[in-house]
Amino acid sequence: MRRLVFPLLVLAAAALAASAFAATRTSDPVVKWKTAQFGSILATKGHLALYTWNQEKVRKVKCTGACAKVWPPITIPHGTMAPKHIAGVMGTFGEVMRPDGKTQLTFNGHPLYTYHGDTPTKILCNGVDGWYVVKVH
């Protein structure tokens, strides 16, 4: 019996340490939102449309500095993991590290942004300079 106690204590301590350092899953940072203008799109929980930029390659961030002020990136807190899937959305979510060290949410590998001039009732920049609303099924 004594021989089992020490290995079990070591195993329990290792499991506890691993759980302390594991990243936690963030709550779904985006939602599927039905609009009259575009149909179903990805949006923030506050119903701001999400965009991708055709100047960026998969998992490569190019919009920084002044660009990121106009097109704020969707970031997730340090130490959390993006959900891989969101109910009702076909596609895969992931993460990319931005040059400033923040973690940005991606959809099918493409970094996600909002537009600073949009409101929940106005989606202003679909198709402007290579920025497109993320339409989903």
Task: Give, region by region, the residue ranges found by the protein language model.
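N-terminal targeting/docking segments
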Residues: M1-R2, L16
